[in-house]
Amino acid sequence: MFCCLGYEWLSGGCKTWHSAWVINTLADHRHRGTDFGGSPWLLIITVFLRSYKFAISLCTSYLCVSFLKTIFPSQNGHDGSTDVQQRARRSNRRRQEGIKIVLEDIFTLWRQVETKVRAKICKMKVTTKVNRHDKINGKRKTAKEHLRKLSMKEREHGEKERQVSEAEENGKLDMKEIHTYMEMFQRAQALRRRAEDYYRCKITPSARKPLCNRVRMAAAEHRHSSGLPYWPYLTAETLKNRMGHQPPPPTQQHSIIDNSLSLKTPPECLLTPLPPSALPSADDNLKTPAECLLYPLPPSADDNLKTPPECLLTPLPPSAPPSVDDNLKTPPKCVCSLPFHPQRMIISRN
């Protein structure tokens, strides 16, 4: 550098702006702060050049430039602060991001071009293949028609798939709704059954209404005569509605008499005497009169009587009104209890 300056001075080309540029550069590299105070190379230059005017002009220019740099901070200078470092890092990052974006754009364009080229090559192949195939039949198709048909088929296939998926979704929703309704119905049924069981088990007969008890008793006694089904948990109102067109049931006294006299034999001939036998038989050892013997009745399923065999026939209780006993036409001597043989005396009972 010194040689260049000396060469310029000796050659007569005194270029002050070049010297100022050199001084400014040296000041930036050697001293980062203010340029006041001078440097040892300034003395060396003045001694080496041995020119008074040049030294004065050089010093004044150097001082002016240093003063201006002190007042106005340089845009290119680096003073070692954190802000400047961060700015430099940001600029480098932006530059790198810009490079990355440019590379991505290039690759994207390259992919697009490659896709277009491949589509064009495929189109050419399809055209040649179709033309070669249809050349025998005298037909000639273009690639556009073939691609149009392919696109139509793809659209139809996609539409069918969409319809199937919609039908499946609708079916799933319907099944879900049906399942929800079924669950609700089952829960309601369970609650209704629980309520019925609770009221059926918890309410005692003494806590029910007397009308309900009377109707239930009538239904229990006359279910066969009325032809109605009998449920013990029927209410009085329901049973009355069902029995609206039926004849009124008989009273309790008549029903008891009917139940006690429900024998298969006619009421006017409960005990009939046997015909007289000509020859003596095994019945002669019986000491009972002949007119009190009974016909042997056929065996029935209700013969499990728990009464002893000697008390099969018991005397009837005396009845005060004569109208009740008028229909009994049996002789009075056969009403009393007599010791009969247990195998020859069988009574049937409904």
From Swiss-Prot:
A Pfam match: NPIP
Disordered: annotated segments: 306-325
InterPro entries in UniProt: NPIP (IPR009443), NPIP_N (IPR054697)
Top-rank taxon, per record: Eukaryota
Family: Belongs to the NPIP family.
Protein name, per record: Nuclear pore complex-interacting protein family member A3
Underlying gene: NPIPA3
